[in-house]
């Protein structure tokens, strides 16, 4: 019998009684009649001894409480899954572009760790090719590095800076055409915005890529997303930070979004990322994974600059993002004022409004030298604080219009701007200046169609 991977206590005893181990196929009947069938997965050392984890045929993992198992049987032999990196050296192809690939801890190109039961990123060139062999026909991975190992919700400004430094280092190599960054999807848009502002003089594409479903799932989007991202990075045509993810639910096309106009708009769909009131820079046809085809959808993207990129500043962390809701106490603003915050981004309603009851707290914040920026919860459309009375009152006390910036982009930008200057007039000037394509200004039409409309099927 194979060795159990961290199954202890009740769960370990039950499996031993039935002669079962990790990798065996099992059929479990629960006390309520629910049947679970699949492969026994390892149990993490951090897990309890009350559950048995099973990977079902649909790719999902489910934990079954031991005290609810009425029947346990083995319908057939399973197998303990394994992962093998490519053996031997990867042959360099001078006809292919050179790309640096970085990992920050997302599920892109992940494999199952059968000691902990978790998914771990493949971050050496051999591991990446072992996970996605089609990469050999698309790029040369001349540099593969694990920059961070974080769930994206744990990202902080110091991590954005670490990634930025690694990007600048990679693109300082004249042989590298572009950089691909594997990143968790939940806060990918924040990181994309941060890199867009803090790196100046990009001499090649920087492409953030993720996966809504890890590569141990049959429905994983990891391979096609990674190949599309690498193809776009290797193309070397764009000098911007971008995000490359599924264009729609099938595996036909990935879209490349501008890093300051993109948002995760769905919790679980593979096409969760959308360019908001903007058109993606390009689409990548990945029906043939070994021969992805790039089609540009707009021509106003920034071209790579000559020379080497550089870090242009940092991020002031004493900045808050506050979403207004009816009945919400303005004391939330006083909290940040009392704690010495330097900036507040408001997500207001409609054209940029909050309750008039908030005016006193907002005026107090402005009088204390705090930059207060207004964005809209609507996401689509532009803040206009000159139309209605509330907007004019807010403008009169010193609230800065956030134009048509997405709230999270305005949040990151304000952190960046406040790191550069304390002068509130200069803060307003910079916040209303288009630095990295974050302010479209209504110049792009066709960004408001429903998901199944013509924009979505670009």
Curated annotation (Swiss-Prot):
SMART domains: Asparaginase. Belongs to the asparaginase 1 family. GatD subfamily. Allows the formation of correctly charged Gln-tRNA(Gln) through the transamidation of misacylated Glu-tRNA(Gln) in organisms which lack glutaminyl-tRNA synthetase. The reaction takes place in the presence of glutamine and ATP through an activated gamma-phospho-Glu-tRNA(Gln). The GatDE system is specific for glutamate and does not act on aspartate. Keywords: ATP-binding, Ligase, Nucleotide-binding, Protein biosynthesis. Residues 97-434 form the Asparaginase/glutaminase domain. One of its GO terms (biological process) is translation. Pfam families: Asparaginase (PF00710), Asparaginase_C (PF17763), GatD_N (PF18195). It comes from Methanopyrus kandleri (strain AV19 / DSM 6324 / JCM 9639 / NBRC 100938). The keyword Membrane does not apply. SUPFAM superfamilies: GatD N-terminal domain-like, Glutaminase/Asparaginase. It catalyses: L-glutamyl-tRNA(Gln) + L-glutamine + ATP + H2O = L-glutaminyl-tRNA(Gln) + L-glutamate + ADP + phosphate + H(+). This is Glutamyl-tRNA(Gln) amidotransferase subunit D. NCBIfam families: asnASE_I, gatD_arch, PRK04183.1. The active site is at residues 107, 185-186, 264.
């Amino acid at each position: 019998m194979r060795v159990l991977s961290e199954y202890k206590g009740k769960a370990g005893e039950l499996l031993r009684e039935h002669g079962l181990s990790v990798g065996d196929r099992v059929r479990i009947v629960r006390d309520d009649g629910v049947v679970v069938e699949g492969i026994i997965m390892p149990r993490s050392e951090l897990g309890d001894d009350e559950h048995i984890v099973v990977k079902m045929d649909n790719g999902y993992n489910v934990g079954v409480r031991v005290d609810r198992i009425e029947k346990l049987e083995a319908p057939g032999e399973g197998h303990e899954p394994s992962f093998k990196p490519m053996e031997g050296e990867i042959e360099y192809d001078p006809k292919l572009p050179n790309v640096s690939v970085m990992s920050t801890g997302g599920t892109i190109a992940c494999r199952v760790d059968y000691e902990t039961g978790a998914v771990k990123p493949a971050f050496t060139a051999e591991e990446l090719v072992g996970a996605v062999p089609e990469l050999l026909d698309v790029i040369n991975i001349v540099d593969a590095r694990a920059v961070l190992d974080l769930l994206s919700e744990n990202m902080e400004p110091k991590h954005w800076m670490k990634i930025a430094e690694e990007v600048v280092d990679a693109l300082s190599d004249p042989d590298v055409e572009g950089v691909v960054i594997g990143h968790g999807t939940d806060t990918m848009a924040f990181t994309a915005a941060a890199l867009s502002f803090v790196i100046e003089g990009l001499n090649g594409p920087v492409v953030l890529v993720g996966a809504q479903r890890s590569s141990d799932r049959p429905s994983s989007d990891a391979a096609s997303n990674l190949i599309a991202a690498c193809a776009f990075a290797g193309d070397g045509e764009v000098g911007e930070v971008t995000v490359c993810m599924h264009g729609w639910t099938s595996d036909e096309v990935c879209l490349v979004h501008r890093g300051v106009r993109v948002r995760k708009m769905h919790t679980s769909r593979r096409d969760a990322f959308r360019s908001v009131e903007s058109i993606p820079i390009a689409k990548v046809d990945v029906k043939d994974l070994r021969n992805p085809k790039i089609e540009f959808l707009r021509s106003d993207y920034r071209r790579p600059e000559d020379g080497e990129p550089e870090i242009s500043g940092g991020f002031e962390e004493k900045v808050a993002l506050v979403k207004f809701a009816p009945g919400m106490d303005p004391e939330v603003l006083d909290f940040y004022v009392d704690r010495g915050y330097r900036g507040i981004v408001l997500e207001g309603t409609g054209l940029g409004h909050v309750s008039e009851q908030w005016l006193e707290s907002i005026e107090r914040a402005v009088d204390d030298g705090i930059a207060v920026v207004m964005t809209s919860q609507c996401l689509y459309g532009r803040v206009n604080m000159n139309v209605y009375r509330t907007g004019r009152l807010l403008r009169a006390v010193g609230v800065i219009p956030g134009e048509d910036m997405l709230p999270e982009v305005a949040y990151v930008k304000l952190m960046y701007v406040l790191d550069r200057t304390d002068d509130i007039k200069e803060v307003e000037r910079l916040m209303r200046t288009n630095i990295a394509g974050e302010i479209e200004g209504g110049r792009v039409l066709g960004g408001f169609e429903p998901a199944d409309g013509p924009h979505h099927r670009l």
